[in-house]
Amino acid sequence: MESNGVPMITLSSGIRMPALGMGTVETMEKGTEREKLAFLKAIEVGYRHFDTAAAYQTEECLGEAIAEALQLGLIKSRDELFITSKLWCADAHADLVLPALQNSLRNLKLDYLDLYLIHHPVSLKPGKFVNEIPKDHILPMDYKSVWAAMEECQTLGFTRAIGVCNFSCKKLQELMATANSPPVVNQVEMSPTLHQKNLREYCKANNIMITAHSVLGAVGAAWGTKAVMHSKVLHQIAVARGKSVAQVSMRWVYQQGASLVVKSFNEARMKENLKIFDWELTAEDMEKISEIPQSRTSSAAFLLSPTGPFKTEEEFWDEKD
Protein backbone atom coordinates (compact mmCIF):
# COMPACT_ATOMS: atom_id res chain seq x y z
CA MET A 1 0.00 0.00 0.00
CA GLU A 2 1.23 3.49 -0.86
CA SER A 3 1.73 6.20 1.78
CA ASN A 4 -1.53 7.82 0.61
CA GLY A 5 -3.40 4.68 1.71
CA VAL A 6 -4.26 3.55 -1.82
CA PRO A 7 -3.45 -0.13 -2.44
CA MET A 8 -1.35 -1.13 -5.43
CA ILE A 9 -2.76 -3.74 -7.80
CA THR A 10 -0.40 -6.01 -9.72
CA LEU A 11 -1.62 -6.38 -13.29
CA SER A 12 -1.17 -9.61 -15.25
CA SER A 13 1.88 -8.14 -17.00
CA GLY A 14 3.55 -7.63 -13.62
CA ILE A 15 3.37 -3.84 -13.37
CA ARG A 16 1.71 -2.25 -10.35
CA MET A 17 -1.18 0.22 -10.64
CA PRO A 18 -2.87 2.28 -7.90
CA ALA A 19 -6.35 0.88 -7.26
CA LEU A 20 -7.85 4.38 -7.40
CA GLY A 21 -7.22 7.02 -10.03
CA MET A 22 -8.46 10.49 -10.86
CA GLY A 23 -10.53 10.76 -14.02
CA THR A 24 -10.21 13.77 -16.32
CA VAL A 25 -13.20 13.42 -18.66
CA GLU A 26 -15.90 16.07 -19.14
CA THR A 27 -14.22 18.83 -17.14
CA MET A 28 -15.97 22.18 -17.43
CA GLU A 29 -12.61 23.94 -17.11
CA LYS A 30 -10.92 22.24 -20.08
CA GLY A 31 -7.47 23.69 -20.70
CA THR A 32 -7.79 26.38 -18.03
CA GLU A 33 -5.62 27.36 -15.10
CA ARG A 34 -8.33 26.02 -12.77
CA GLU A 35 -8.12 22.60 -14.39
CA LYS A 36 -4.33 22.54 -14.00
CA LEU A 37 -4.61 23.62 -10.36
CA ALA A 38 -7.15 20.85 -9.74
CA PHE A 39 -4.72 18.26 -11.08
CA LEU A 40 -1.95 19.78 -8.95
CA LYS A 41 -4.17 19.67 -5.87
CA ALA A 42 -4.98 16.02 -6.60
CA ILE A 43 -1.27 15.20 -6.64
CA GLU A 44 -0.77 17.19 -3.43
CA VAL A 45 -3.52 15.32 -1.53
CA GLY A 46 -2.25 11.92 -2.65
CA TYR A 47 -3.50 10.88 -6.09
CA ARG A 48 -0.87 9.05 -8.11
CA HIS A 49 -2.98 7.55 -10.92
CA PHE A 50 -4.44 9.87 -13.58
CA ASP A 51 -6.73 8.70 -16.35
CA THR A 52 -6.86 10.82 -19.51
CA ALA A 53 -7.46 10.34 -23.24
CA ALA A 54 -6.85 12.06 -26.54
CA ALA A 55 -10.61 12.59 -26.85
CA TYR A 56 -10.87 14.27 -23.43
CA GLN A 57 -8.57 17.11 -24.56
CA THR A 58 -7.06 17.21 -21.07
CA GLU A 59 -3.65 15.69 -21.84
CA GLU A 60 -1.84 19.02 -22.25
CA CYS A 61 -3.20 20.49 -19.03
CA LEU A 62 -2.38 17.31 -17.11
CA GLY A 63 1.13 17.41 -18.57
CA GLU A 64 1.58 20.98 -17.35
CA ALA A 65 0.39 19.96 -13.89
CA ILE A 66 2.83 17.04 -13.75
CA ALA A 67 5.72 19.30 -14.78
CA GLU A 68 4.77 21.86 -12.14
CA ALA A 69 4.35 19.15 -9.48
CA LEU A 70 7.91 18.04 -10.16
CA GLN A 71 9.16 21.63 -10.02
CA LEU A 72 7.35 22.24 -6.71
CA GLY A 73 8.63 19.00 -5.21
CA LEU A 74 5.16 17.48 -4.76
CA ILE A 75 6.65 14.38 -6.38
CA LYS A 76 10.32 13.53 -6.73
CA SER A 77 10.08 11.87 -10.14
CA ARG A 78 7.61 11.08 -12.90
CA ASP A 79 7.97 7.40 -11.92
CA GLU A 80 5.83 8.08 -8.83
CA LEU A 81 2.81 8.57 -11.10
CA PHE A 82 0.74 6.10 -13.10
CA ILE A 83 -0.55 7.78 -16.26
CA THR A 84 -3.22 6.22 -18.47
CA SER A 85 -4.31 7.56 -21.85
CA LYS A 86 -6.46 6.22 -24.67
CA LEU A 87 -6.36 5.68 -28.43
CA TRP A 88 -9.16 7.57 -30.14
CA CYS A 89 -11.29 5.73 -32.71
CA ALA A 90 -10.09 7.80 -35.69
CA ASP A 91 -6.56 6.62 -34.89
CA ALA A 92 -7.61 2.99 -34.43
CA HIS A 93 -5.84 1.86 -37.59
CA ALA A 94 -2.61 -0.14 -37.60
CA ASP A 95 -0.46 2.63 -39.10
CA LEU A 96 -1.87 5.39 -36.86
CA VAL A 97 -1.60 3.81 -33.40
CA LEU A 98 2.06 4.64 -32.76
CA PRO A 99 1.79 8.24 -34.05
CA ALA A 100 -1.31 8.74 -31.89
CA LEU A 101 0.50 7.51 -28.78
CA GLN A 102 3.50 9.69 -29.56
CA ASN A 103 1.18 12.69 -29.92
CA SER A 104 -0.32 11.93 -26.49
CA LEU A 105 3.19 11.79 -25.06
CA ARG A 106 3.98 15.20 -26.58
CA ASN A 107 0.80 16.62 -25.08
CA LEU A 108 1.66 15.16 -21.67
CA LYS A 109 5.35 16.08 -21.96
CA LEU A 110 6.24 12.49 -21.00
CA ASP A 111 8.58 9.85 -22.38
CA TYR A 112 6.21 6.97 -21.72
CA LEU A 113 2.73 6.03 -20.52
CA ASP A 114 2.04 3.45 -17.85
CA LEU A 115 -1.10 2.23 -19.61
CA TYR A 116 -2.51 2.82 -23.11
CA LEU A 117 -6.07 1.75 -23.83
CA ILE A 118 -8.17 1.35 -26.97
CA HIS A 119 -11.01 3.78 -26.22
CA HIS A 120 -13.85 1.94 -28.00
CA PRO A 121 -14.18 -1.33 -29.98
CA VAL A 122 -14.80 0.60 -33.20
CA SER A 123 -12.78 2.64 -35.70
CA LEU A 124 -13.56 5.90 -37.49
CA LYS A 125 -12.29 7.32 -40.74
CA PRO A 126 -8.92 8.96 -39.97
CA GLY A 127 -9.08 12.62 -39.09
CA LYS A 128 -9.19 15.13 -36.26
CA PHE A 129 -11.44 14.62 -33.26
CA VAL A 130 -14.97 15.97 -33.79
CA ASN A 131 -17.90 16.06 -31.38
CA GLU A 132 -20.45 15.18 -34.06
CA ILE A 133 -19.33 11.99 -35.82
CA PRO A 134 -20.76 11.50 -39.34
CA LYS A 135 -22.48 8.14 -39.48
CA ASP A 136 -20.60 7.13 -42.63
CA HIS A 137 -17.29 7.59 -40.78
CA ILE A 138 -18.00 4.69 -38.38
CA LEU A 139 -16.05 1.58 -39.34
CA PRO A 140 -15.40 -1.93 -38.01
CA MET A 141 -12.14 -2.24 -36.13
CA ASP A 142 -9.53 -4.68 -37.38
CA TYR A 143 -8.76 -6.04 -33.92
CA LYS A 144 -5.79 -8.09 -35.09
CA SER A 145 -3.81 -5.30 -36.75
CA VAL A 146 -4.75 -2.57 -34.26
CA TRP A 147 -3.86 -4.74 -31.29
CA ALA A 148 -0.58 -5.77 -32.95
CA ALA A 149 0.23 -2.05 -33.23
CA MET A 150 -0.61 -1.60 -29.54
CA GLU A 151 1.75 -4.48 -28.72
CA GLU A 152 4.45 -2.80 -30.79
CA CYS A 153 4.03 0.40 -28.77
CA GLN A 154 4.67 -1.62 -25.62
CA THR A 155 7.67 -3.39 -27.15
CA LEU A 156 9.17 -0.02 -28.11
CA GLY A 157 8.80 1.22 -24.53
CA PHE A 158 6.30 4.00 -25.20
CA THR A 159 3.82 2.37 -22.81
CA ARG A 160 4.39 -0.10 -19.99
CA ALA A 161 1.05 -1.87 -20.46
CA ILE A 162 -1.86 -2.02 -22.91
CA GLY A 163 -5.57 -2.63 -22.56
CA VAL A 164 -9.04 -1.70 -23.75
CA CYS A 165 -12.18 0.21 -22.78
CA ASN A 166 -15.83 -0.64 -23.28
CA PHE A 167 -15.19 -4.18 -24.55
CA SER A 168 -17.82 -6.87 -23.94
CA CYS A 169 -16.96 -10.52 -23.26
CA LYS A 170 -17.56 -11.32 -26.93
CA LYS A 171 -15.31 -8.52 -28.17
CA LEU A 172 -12.56 -9.43 -25.71
CA GLN A 173 -12.73 -12.99 -26.97
CA GLU A 174 -12.39 -11.81 -30.58
CA LEU A 175 -9.41 -9.60 -29.75
CA MET A 176 -7.61 -12.24 -27.69
CA ALA A 177 -8.01 -14.88 -30.40
CA THR A 178 -5.14 -13.28 -32.33
CA ALA A 179 -3.31 -11.38 -29.56
CA ASN A 180 0.23 -12.22 -28.51
CA SER A 181 -0.23 -10.30 -25.26
CA PRO A 182 -3.74 -10.11 -23.77
CA PRO A 183 -5.10 -6.77 -22.51
CA VAL A 184 -4.29 -6.21 -18.84
CA VAL A 185 -7.19 -3.81 -18.23
CA ASN A 186 -10.75 -3.35 -19.49
CA GLN A 187 -12.14 0.03 -18.42
CA VAL A 188 -15.95 -0.02 -18.34
CA GLU A 189 -18.90 1.55 -16.60
CA MET A 190 -19.46 -0.17 -13.25
CA SER A 191 -21.34 0.96 -10.16
CA PRO A 192 -23.99 -0.24 -7.71
CA THR A 193 -26.51 0.48 -10.49
CA LEU A 194 -24.56 -1.50 -13.13
CA HIS A 195 -22.88 -4.52 -11.56
CA GLN A 196 -21.37 -6.02 -14.75
CA LYS A 197 -21.38 -9.46 -13.10
CA ASN A 198 -20.86 -11.55 -16.27
CA LEU A 199 -18.13 -9.26 -17.58
CA ARG A 200 -16.39 -9.24 -14.20
CA GLU A 201 -16.37 -13.03 -14.09
CA TYR A 202 -15.04 -13.28 -17.65
CA CYS A 203 -12.28 -10.74 -17.02
CA LYS A 204 -11.27 -12.43 -13.77
CA ALA A 205 -11.02 -15.80 -15.53
CA ASN A 206 -8.75 -14.20 -18.15
CA ASN A 207 -6.59 -12.16 -15.75
CA ILE A 208 -7.95 -8.84 -17.02
CA MET A 209 -8.35 -6.13 -14.39
CA ILE A 210 -11.56 -4.15 -14.63
CA THR A 211 -11.22 -0.43 -14.05
CA ALA A 212 -14.60 1.09 -13.28
CA HIS A 213 -15.66 4.48 -14.57
CA SER A 214 -18.91 6.36 -13.82
CA VAL A 215 -18.80 4.81 -10.34
CA LEU A 216 -20.81 7.73 -8.94
CA GLY A 217 -23.13 7.96 -11.94
CA ALA A 218 -21.02 10.50 -13.87
CA VAL A 219 -23.23 13.33 -12.59
CA GLY A 220 -22.53 16.42 -14.69
CA ALA A 221 -21.43 14.46 -17.75
CA ALA A 222 -23.58 14.30 -20.88
CA TRP A 223 -24.48 10.67 -20.10
CA GLY A 224 -24.69 11.11 -16.33
CA THR A 225 -27.39 9.92 -13.93
CA LYS A 226 -28.34 10.70 -10.33
CA ALA A 227 -29.41 7.10 -9.72
CA VAL A 228 -26.27 6.28 -7.71
CA MET A 229 -26.02 9.39 -5.56
CA HIS A 230 -29.79 9.45 -4.92
CA SER A 231 -30.08 5.73 -4.12
CA LYS A 232 -32.04 5.19 -0.90
CA VAL A 233 -30.26 1.87 -0.34
CA LEU A 234 -26.82 3.46 -0.61
CA HIS A 235 -27.94 6.37 1.57
CA GLN A 236 -29.12 4.02 4.33
CA ILE A 237 -25.84 2.10 4.24
CA ALA A 238 -23.84 5.34 4.24
CA VAL A 239 -25.65 6.63 7.34
CA ALA A 240 -25.16 3.32 9.15
CA ARG A 241 -21.44 3.24 8.34
CA GLY A 242 -20.76 6.92 8.93
CA LYS A 243 -19.65 7.32 5.32
CA SER A 244 -20.85 9.22 2.26
CA VAL A 245 -22.89 7.66 -0.55
CA ALA A 246 -19.89 8.21 -2.84
CA GLN A 247 -17.61 6.29 -0.46
CA VAL A 248 -20.09 3.41 -0.23
CA SER A 249 -20.36 3.20 -4.03
CA MET A 250 -16.58 3.30 -4.47
CA ARG A 251 -16.00 0.77 -1.69
CA TRP A 252 -18.54 -1.59 -3.29
CA VAL A 253 -16.62 -1.47 -6.59
CA TYR A 254 -13.33 -2.13 -4.81
CA GLN A 255 -14.78 -5.08 -2.88
CA GLN A 256 -15.77 -6.62 -6.22
CA GLY A 257 -12.06 -6.82 -7.06
CA ALA A 258 -12.06 -3.89 -9.49
CA SER A 259 -9.95 -0.75 -9.66
CA LEU A 260 -11.65 2.58 -10.28
CA VAL A 261 -11.32 6.14 -11.53
CA VAL A 262 -13.39 9.01 -10.15
CA LYS A 263 -13.32 12.75 -10.75
CA SER A 264 -13.75 15.72 -8.46
CA PHE A 265 -12.29 19.22 -8.51
CA ASN A 266 -13.40 19.81 -4.92
CA GLU A 267 -10.51 19.35 -2.48
CA ALA A 268 -12.66 17.99 0.35
CA ARG A 269 -14.22 15.38 -1.94
CA MET A 270 -10.82 14.51 -3.40
CA LYS A 271 -9.65 13.66 0.11
CA GLU A 272 -12.88 11.87 0.99
CA ASN A 273 -12.64 9.67 -2.11
CA LEU A 274 -9.23 8.41 -0.98
CA LYS A 275 -10.68 7.16 2.32
CA ILE A 276 -12.31 3.92 1.17
CA PHE A 277 -9.60 1.39 1.90
CA ASP A 278 -9.51 1.12 5.72
CA TRP A 279 -13.06 -0.20 6.24
CA GLU A 280 -15.40 -2.75 4.65
CA LEU A 281 -19.02 -3.15 3.67
CA THR A 282 -20.68 -6.03 5.49
CA ALA A 283 -22.20 -9.09 3.84
CA GLU A 284 -25.60 -7.58 4.64
CA ASP A 285 -24.61 -4.33 2.92
CA MET A 286 -23.45 -6.24 -0.14
CA GLU A 287 -26.70 -8.19 -0.26
CA LYS A 288 -28.75 -4.98 -0.18
CA ILE A 289 -26.67 -3.48 -2.99
CA SER A 290 -27.12 -6.65 -5.06
CA GLU A 291 -30.86 -5.91 -5.15
CA ILE A 292 -30.55 -2.37 -6.55
CA PRO A 293 -32.25 -2.09 -10.00
CA GLN A 294 -29.72 -2.20 -12.82
CA SER A 295 -29.41 0.15 -15.78
CA ARG A 296 -26.61 1.34 -18.06
CA THR A 297 -25.74 5.03 -17.95
CA SER A 298 -23.17 5.35 -20.73
CA SER A 299 -24.50 5.30 -24.28
CA ALA A 300 -22.85 4.20 -27.52
CA ALA A 301 -25.39 6.09 -29.66
CA PHE A 302 -22.68 8.29 -31.18
CA LEU A 303 -20.92 5.16 -32.52
CA LEU A 304 -24.01 3.47 -33.97
CA SER A 305 -24.82 3.56 -37.68
CA PRO A 306 -27.11 1.71 -40.12
CA THR A 307 -24.01 1.08 -42.26
CA GLY A 308 -21.50 0.62 -39.43
CA PRO A 309 -20.45 -2.43 -37.41
CA PHE A 310 -23.04 -1.77 -34.67
CA LYS A 311 -26.59 -0.66 -35.40
CA THR A 312 -28.00 -0.83 -31.87
CA GLU A 313 -26.86 -0.40 -28.26
CA GLU A 314 -27.50 -4.13 -27.77
CA GLU A 315 -25.06 -4.97 -30.57
CA PHE A 316 -22.44 -2.60 -29.21
CA TRP A 317 -22.60 -3.93 -25.65
CA ASP A 318 -23.57 -7.48 -26.70
CA GLU A 319 -26.67 -7.34 -24.56
CA LYS A 320 -29.96 -9.02 -25.30
CA ASP A 321 -33.02 -6.95 -26.17
UniProtKB/Swiss-Prot annotation:
Protein name as it appears in the record: NADPH-dependent codeinone reductase 1-5
BP terms from Gene Ontology: alkaloid metabolic process
Lineage, broadest ranks: Eukaryota, Viridiplantae, Streptophyta, Embryophyta, Tracheophyta
Subcellular location: Cytoplasm, Cytosol
Residues noted as binding substrate in the record, renumbered to the chain: H119
Effect of W279S: Slightly reduced neopine yield and hampered velocity with respect to codeine oxidation
Temperature remarks: Optimum temperature is 30-42 degrees Celsius.
CC annotations in GO: cytosol
